[in-house]
Amino acid sequence: EAEPHSTTVGPVNGVAGVNPANLRRWFDKRVDGFGDDPTFEQIQGGHSNLTFTVRDGSGRRWVLRRPPLGHVLATAHDMAREHRVISALADSDVPVPTVVGLCEDTTVNGAPFYVMEFVDGIVVRDVATAATLPIKIRERMGRSLVEVLGRLHSVDVDAVGLGNLGRRDGYIERQLKRWRAQFEQSTTREVPRVLEVHETLVARIPPQQGVGIVHGDYRIDNTIMTGDGEIAAVLDW
């Protein structure tokens, strides 16, 4: 039996991008004891997708991610892909939030979205935030970033079910081709040296040694840190 949905997908109660009535029904079916009077607050700082904190009447929190409002490129805002990666890494050595569920029915909230558990911690978005932390904690954060990145690159993509996430061959060649196309589309003058460097790199592509996961935007403010300087979760996949 189909459940009823409100058709409002614009600003609701002052929050654009969420439909409280529909989302309440969605949460009720997937979260035991979901409380009354949920609130939705957009988390500032992200630019690729809209991210909201969802809080029920008892104070429990979750995080909802959806594409930006308006026309978007599906490949750049693929919620199912992001949900799949985080779910696959749940039992790995890479810390990620626990996933609650994915919704690809756009009648619920105007666009696909997924929900994950809220991870408490520190997000170092700028120098001012970092300056409030002791030197030893900042040092540990830096080391943790490197260690977790190494763990990510060591994940066996087939073992975690991501072996078919993307093409497995010719990664460097495809990257060089993309960069040249982007350069040619954006340049307004002749820069022959750039093309010379491109041709040199193409001629020296090393043999591929394996297949791994590349985050694509791995940086400190796409992580949540503990007070001890350890990564609690890697975000923005």
Q: Which sequence ranges carry the predicted segments?
A:
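Pre-DFG segment of protein kinase catalytic domains
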Residues: A233-D236
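Short acidic (Asp/Glu) and glycine-rich catalytic loops that position anionic groups and cofactors
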Residues: E3-H5, R178, I231
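Catalytic-loop of the protein kinase fold
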Residues: I213-H215, I220
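ATP-binding pocket architecture of kinase catalytic cores
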Residues: D37-I213, T226-G229
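Juxta-kinase regulatory segment immediately upstream of eukaryotic protein kinase catalytic domains
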Residues: A2-F34, P38
